[in-house]
Amino acid sequence: MENLNAYFKSVIDQDTASVVLCDLQHTILYMNPAAIRNYAKRGGAALIGRSLLHCHNASSNSRIQEVVDWFAASPEHNIIYTYHNEKQNKDVYMVALRDADGTLIGYYEKHEYRSPETMERYAF
């Protein structure tokens, strides 16, 4: 099978929800275009290479580390619900990133919007 990395990157790049990938030291490795736009007031693309922990308060940082520790405790621990954003009507999860051997290599925040789509169907 050919290398699928370009396909996977394109899937993430086209997602309308923010995707921010972090390593286990909480360094932001990648932000998709939606994340760059959504976090523009906090620095947008300039956040890449910086610590995600600098974007949160001490309480949030503690919870982030608690979740990462939980991910590390078992290869069965891969997703956890973190909160509901009422204003944007979305649920937010933290998701473990693992290599082919199941070793934890990082994490990302997953946004699931609950509002009905407003885009016209098949609006070419």
Regions flagged by a language model, labelled:
Residues 75, 79-91, 99, 105:
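Per-ARNT-Sim (PAS) sensory domains and their PAS-associated C-terminal
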Residues 45-59:
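PAS-family sensory/regulatory domains
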Residues 1-36:
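Sensory modules in modular signal-transduction proteins
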Residues 37-47:
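PAS/PAS-like sensory domain cap-loop motif
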Residues 58-79:
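Soluble sensory domains of the PAS superfamily and closely related sensory modules
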Residues 97-124:
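Sensory coupling linkers of modular signal transduction proteins
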Residues 36-37, 53:
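Sensory helix hotspots in PAS and closely related PAS-like folds
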